[in-house]
Amino acid sequence: EGFFVTGISTRTADASIRYTLNGTKPTPEKGIIYDGPFLIASSTTVRAMAYKEGMVSTNVDAQSYFFTGDIINQSEMNPGITNSPTYRDELREALKKLPVVSLSFEQNTIFGRSGIYENSDDKGRGSEREIHFEYFDPANPDDSVHEPAGLRIHGGNSRQHPKKPLRIYFRDDYGDSRLEHDIFPDSPVKTFKSLLLRGGGHDAWTFDSRWREASFVRNQFLHQVQREMGQTSPHGRHVNVFLNGQYWGLYELQEFPHEHYNADHHGGDPEDWDIVKHGQEVEAGSRAAWDALIDLAESGINSSKDYAAIQEYLDLENFADAMIQRIWASDEDWLSPFFLNGRDISTFSDDKNWYVGRKSRNGTTKFFFYNWDAEMSMGIPFSDLQTFENDFSRINNARSPGIIYDALRRYPEFQLFFADRLRKHCFFGGALTLGPLRENWIDYTETVRSPVVAESARWGVQAWLEQDRFFPFTRDDEWLPAVNWVRDQFLPNRTREILNQFRQVNLYPNTEAPLILPFGVNSETPIEVSMNTGTNNSTIYFTKDGSDPRIAGLTSTTILIGENSNVRVIIPDALINNEIGFTWRSIKPPSNLNNWISGTNGVGYERSSRGTYLSFISTTVDEMWDTNASAYLRYEFEIPDLKTLQSLDSLVLQMRYDDGFAAYLNGTLVSWSNYGTSAWNSTSSSPTNDNEAVVFEGFDLTPQISQLQVGTNVLAIHGQNTSPRSSDFLIEAALTSSSSAPSKISPSALSYSGPIELNTSGVIKARTLTDSGQWSALTESYFSIASPADAGNLLVTEIHYHPADASTAGELTISTNKDDYEFLELLNTSGNEIDLSDYNFTRGLAF
């Protein structure tokens, strides 16, 4: 409010200063020559530089001044809000509630016919334009920073929205190569190579009128959930954005997980990192490690050896938590398929909106999986139906995190590991329990409660897919009901819903995990702990040494039909049908078997220019086109003896298919999908998307394992197309069986028979084991039996900072990096154990 008298100075004697007030960049030839302090009485961005003959000119500095009265009266602000008796008095304060990001620039480089806003599909370095970045908090004058930078339009679909996301790059070309400021107080990183301004995407009002459910906070909230699960996730905060002084709305200022982010958070140099995102697009480094990981997944996880191999690339905790968090979020703009009430309602069939990073050079890490662009979630539906019941537990997109999840979720050891992570996060105050979820949701929504009023004035009527609305969306009519629905419906119900969904795919057992009482307490004196389970005919086993009471068994896999297996195929016609009828399905060969085509697994044809199936087809049936929509296939395989047969305890059929099939094992129908009828010329009941067809879909045939016999067995497939003139066709089958050595009770495990006394600090880990051999998920609880730490019993006694290079043989064996020898020593001066669990270093340490 009021006015400012502003002066500009330089330390260089006799230097001249030029400045601008319209966002343009001053030069020694362009701009107002500074001759003394001047008055600023309206919203203004001052850009200034100093120059002197014979010397290098300074870079350009910028300082923005905003008057709330000016902002409210800008031409883009809707008078239905600015003059509203409900909102007009709140608007001035709403504009001060958040930090400000002000971007100043040559107007025609961003807007107008040649500007990047108009040409929003342009990408890459060539689309980057020079700007000046300012960040400041109206409530804290010391919390400010500014730096020359580059600007690009960001995103996919959201590039077309009227309120576009923006990427900011800090480079030597413009000023300093990194921005140095404590922008995100809860982040250990204080310098940034680039930042992202997200406009809200589908969680904003600028998509179309169906988006009444917008909250503007879903993305940040879900990053917070991933961090509270113990994983790394980009930090961010909400800001008010101004472009050349024009209020541009409520944005999220955040990190994004490129190579610089990963180096900052996980170590190494940016050049060491591979960054791969949706569509397998390589943002940095190489895709070699990602391809190796995907190849392992697409080959299937069928044995202990396979499970160990995939863990060379995967941190299972990070991966499982990422899948749990994203599935919990019910993100309709991510992976597929997903279901509601048993019906596939997938919005997209291609994979979208994921980011992974791996350090592959100068030392390696495993892949980190990041929550990314997750705002079309938590009741933001592409359909008009808000629900907390979407089921993403069967995602399987090819060459994406979905196929990794799909392969792992069929392996028994991962099933129980995944259940352990669910137990950790969905119970006992974990990240996906109602208390933390609701607290975080309320914190984020309260942060933007007033700023949403300004957003309503700026963007309440504009949308991408339609003409402007006649009445603006408002906080009280649209935003409040939307955020309250999440608070009162989605959050209380979603965790229970996903647990039920995961039970259906064997990722959470029906055996009830032990309840430990009390759970995770701090006490200065010994305490009594009890356990119970609701599962009958079971025993609780627990340990007090931090180990798992269960020892995993080993699993081996028998490939009955693989990618190089032989196959016989025929395209039936009326004469063939009259001769063989249904006998082709049985073990006994049909009478015309010598007329069948002999080949290798992977049967089909491809007439489309896309060529999607060519790499999967080994045996071509071009004669099928325009002749028949059906094909018959026979795979023969051997089980050598009774011992082998009796060792098989599971049976899984995997199918690539376009468009439908029915499978017969030794003449018995065991599985089908999109199957029309058994007629020799039947078409499929529905089509299969090409992207889905190339992904193996699993069908559990364990209940039909008794159909197997010693000697020759036959898997017969009736493959079906949508029509005889379909442009492509594909059938590929794989059949595997596994033999598992049972898991064991750990030698250090104790069976629970009654309350136990704890007199020392430690971790109790407990599982329920049923009499039939089924284990529960793991319940884990830490107990501190110690005095609280305070200034009377805890001292910092030694700091080893900036040590010399490692030189002795012993030192060089441990590490050649001298930073590894830095340490801080704490001393307990009491005679008893003290509890440090509630303490952390908030200042003075950086990594």
Residue ranges of each PLM-predicted region?
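Surface-exposed loop and adjacent secondary-structure segments within mature catalytic domains
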Residues: 167, 183-184, 249-301, 307-308, ...
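Activation on beta-sandwich/Ig-like modules and their edge loops
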Residues: 554-559, 563, 570-572, 578, ...
